Amino acid sequence: LCYNQMGVPSSVLPGSRVLIVDSFGVLAYLYRYADAVWIGGGFNPSGIHNTVEAAVYGKAVLFGPRYKRFREAYDMLALGGAASYGEGDAAAIAALLKDHKALSAMGDSALEYVALQAGATERIVSYIVLKYLSTSA
């Protein structure tokens, strides 16, 4: 565990095994350095934070049990790019973090999820135009 008061994301220290971030606006820059990413909020009634930000970098996405309101988390679990753990799962998490082959496969699956979402904006805009903006003759 490395403690560092970061001024900028480039201050991530080589060889650090755990990085805990309590700052706004830097996570998207830091995910690339990880083997796996624990997404916060999974033990909180409001649920998890953004899982796609980590998946974009092809990282294994891990989170607590309160993810069911978040479709992307559910879909990533189904593809094998994510895993959900409860309070008693520390040994299982530790085992996964040592299994670099499994982490790599999960990261590939997370990246696959991101690729499957390509074109979503175009599909949504087309739907809105057809449903609400097109004129009938």
Regions found by a protein language model. Name each.
Residues 1-137:
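Nucleotide-activated sugar donor-binding and catalytic core shared by glycosyltransferases
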